[in-house]
Design a protein with these regions (language model features):
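Hydrophobic (often cysteine-bearing) scaffold residues that line and stabilize catalytic clefts
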Residues: 34, 177, 203, 207
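Internal maturation/activation junctions in enzymes
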Residues: 190-255
Length: 255
């Protein structure tokens, strides 16, 4: 999150959540981490970074022919692109997109070229950082030049668990995905879902109730371990997860 972010930035004056602010627009944006993550993982590779990124630069520069599905997606998102950007992005054009059109992304090509030539500094400092923060200021976002310059990628151990003899590997905190997956899979592990029938009311209800419990835990306990204490061992323990399902009644919604 940006350094100036606060715990109530997505709340109204009465303390009620303003969901749109956390999901769309400049205020919803966290400091971009993909570039730092790519450079952190690159040390395990063999090819030079410039060679790896060059095909993407050329594709963005020359463009590619879009499919009918891609045209529908771009057209369907046009209003959102126009609403949440102060400068029209490459994904928006005057007339509707159609299959066979070429999507050219000159700004992306320029951004990737700066990364190719200057490494991480080509993104987190200099021209790209300036462009990002200027857009943030125009749109009411919080990402600053200092946020970008100070960004680092953190290496964390993945979540690993067993499910019916299979080893499952998931994302660690601050992503909740890995722990949520572990909770949900463990809560249904001793149940014969196949016998319920695909997409039957019984199987759908079971999955809904399992997800409700996991996401309730997500809202209550999960977050960035650098800032909050997440009771990982408890949330993933067989005893705890069995207790979470004690009030599950087939055919009835849990209050």
């Amino acid at each position: 999150a940006p350094g100036s972010a606060s715990r109530d930035m997505y709340l109204d004056k009465d303390g009620n959540p303003l969901l749109n602010l956390s999901q769309n627009g400049h205020l919803a944006s966290g400091v971009p981490g993909t570039v730092a993550g790519l450079f952190a993982s690159h040390k395990y590779g063999k090819l030079g970074f410039a060679a790896l990124i060059q095909p993407a630069i050329e594709l963005a520069e020359k463009g590619f022919v879009i499919t009918a599905a891609e045209a529908r997606s771009l057209n369907g998102s046009k209003s959102a692109f126009e609403k949440y950007n102060t400068i029209r992005p490459a994904f928006v054009k005057k007339n509707a997109w159609k299959a066979g059109d070429t999507l050219v992304q000159k700004d992306l090509a320029a951004t990737l070229s700066r990364i190719r030539d200057n490494g991480m500094k080509g993104f987190y400092e200099g021209e790209t950082a300036k462009l990002i923060t200027e857009e943030m200021k125009r749109g009411g976002g919080k990402i600053s030049l200092e946020d970008l310059k100070n960004y680092t990628a953190a290496k964390r151990d993945p979540i690993i668990f067993d499910y019916k003899g299979h080893t499952v590997i998931g994302m660690p905190m601050p992503s909740s995905g890995g722990l949520l997956m572990q909770q949900m899979m463990k809560m249904i592990e001793d149940r014969d879902i196949a016998s319920m029938g695909f997409h039957s009311s019984a199987s759908v209800q079971l999955m809904i109730e399992v997800e409700r419990r996991a996401y309730a835990d997500r809202a209550e306990f999960m977050g960035d371990k650098d800032f909050v204490k997440v009771p990982m061992k408890t949330l993933s323990s067989d005893i705890y997860l069995k207790e979470r399902m004690n009030d599950f009644i087939p055919g009835k919604a849990t209050p």
